[in-house]
Amino acid sequence: VSVSAADKSMIGAYSGAAALKKQGAANSSKFGGTLAGAVAYNGVKTGVTAQIKDAAITDAQSITNLATREGAVVAAGLALGVDTATTGGATSLNAGVSASVNEINSGTHAVMNNVTTNNAKGKTAVNNIAQSKDIQVAGGITAQYAKGGGIGIGAAVSSLHAANDIQSRITNSDLHDIGTLKAYAQTDLVQVGTVLSAGVIQGHTGN
């Protein structure tokens, strides 16, 4: 007897923003700038349940009840600002902001409830297993480049909030003639939260 439930979904929220400004030498502006902002948000609730319920199982060599979650949830934001002002007297403000948020509520359950086993021919191997192998990522990147009299400001924020509920349960059951019994919940999660902000300012020439 074999029952399995699997969730292998790939869920992503991606955002990007870019700002570009170019000034020639004849530009008399005393102030210029670029602003780029990007926000990526995931609000995810997932659940997978493998269940054997209200069953009488006779003479089974093995009973396997397996719940598996094996996917990825990604939030990524990218902000890019480029200012190529070449005017001699201008001041350039170049700003980039990136925010990435992952809010994850995940459940992986293997449940045997009100199950009766008998085996007149030998012993039964019972496996009740819940396992989660998710990849959960929140990442933000900003990059700023200003040419001329410039100021570069960059901010990258990432937030990863994950509630992973992994359960293996055998309840209200009467198991007879059992050779081996394996009931466990296993997690092998990869969780990454990363930010990167970079800015390059080149001095202006002229008066």
Name each region found by the language model.
Residues 1-207:
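Low-complexity, glycine- and small/polar-enriched segments
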